[in-house]
């Protein structure tokens, strides 16, 4: 029973953890591609070989081109939510926690996968119309 209990069994928890890790990998890949586009960097031409990249392609988040992967419109929207969450959280931390700017990234890298729309809205309201994060990067606007 402890192994296969539907919600609290070892197997259920393992599956839940694997699903979470997969989602984080996919979101990180989307955000990475978005940041590459933002900075004008060359796309990773070998990126299509990875399982995550293939999954994103099959699910319509990215397309393969000669020079690598590009975000589809839906992939771009999803990536912007992740990058926006990250940069909003860095900005909030920069205002409220006594951390050097170079220490803001690691906690934001984790929390970006957990900020829901309601929490993002609360942070936005508290920050006002903040356009730039503490590193000087533009915070993407939310698309309606």
Where are these regions (language model features)?
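Membrane-interfacial segments at transmembrane helix termini in multi-pass membrane proteins
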Residues: 1-32, 117-138
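Structured cytosolic domains appended to multi-pass membrane proteins
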Residues: 39-144
